[in-house]
Regions:
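Phosphate-binding and adjacent anionic-ligand microenvironments
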Residues: 7-175
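Cysteine protease catalytic core and zymogen-processing segment of caspase-like enzymes
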Residues: 1-7
Length: 175
């Protein structure tokens, strides 16, 4: 959508994603010369940042997409209509929907009694160790769930084994 909106001069500014947005998307948008900014996870934060930068396209990896041209909240029906409109123009779904290669991304959700466990020294050391191991070959995101008693660990890298290794280090410090 971002590329099509840019070509039609509908896109205002760029795209807002979240901390969970795949780096493959960010890289694709960069090659298309479309600005991309991240914000906290949640439609509320995406919408706030869209308003702050006067952007009209944003969304979450979960599929919640906000088309600011039409609505101020995510609307799956509206997104489906936009995709169908693009398909009507003669493109195949495979061409339209497979425009970038996502990096392998692994998400682990760990049930905890106390979400503040990630603030403990043992856990902080493990996070530092895992980030050092990642050493520019990917990224890690460790956060408390906003809705459940869980710690969410997301690892992203071209090297899946590296992701598993880093997540394991952090998981051991939490359990």
């Amino acid at each position: 959508l971002a590329r099509r909106w840019k070509m039609k001069k509908i896109l205002k500014g760029g795209v807002i994603g979240t901390l969970m947005s795949n780096y493959g998307l960010e890289n694709f948008l960069r090659t298309e010369k479309i600005k991309f900014f991240r914000t906290k996870v949640g439609d509320r934060y995406v919408k706030e940042k869209m308003k702050k930068f006067n952007f009209n396209l944003g969304g979450e990896q979960s599929g919640h997409i906000i088309l600011g041209k039409f609505a101020t909240t995510g609307d799956g029906l509206m997104v489906a209509l936009e995709v169908l409109f693009s398909l009507r123009k003669g493109k195949k779904a495979s061409q339209l929907l497979n425009v970038f290669k996502p990096l392998p991304q692994i998400l682990e959700n760990i049930m905890v009694k106390n979400k503040n466990v990630i603030n403990k020294t043992k856990c902080k050391k493990a996070i530092r160790k895992a980030n050092k191991l990642m050493n520019g070959y990917g990224r890690l995101l460790i956060r408390k769930s906003g809705t459940e008693p869980k710690i969410r660990i997301m690892g992203e890298s071209y090297d899946k084994n590296l992701i598993f290794k880093c997540i394991k280090i952090i998981k051991r410090s939490i359990k």
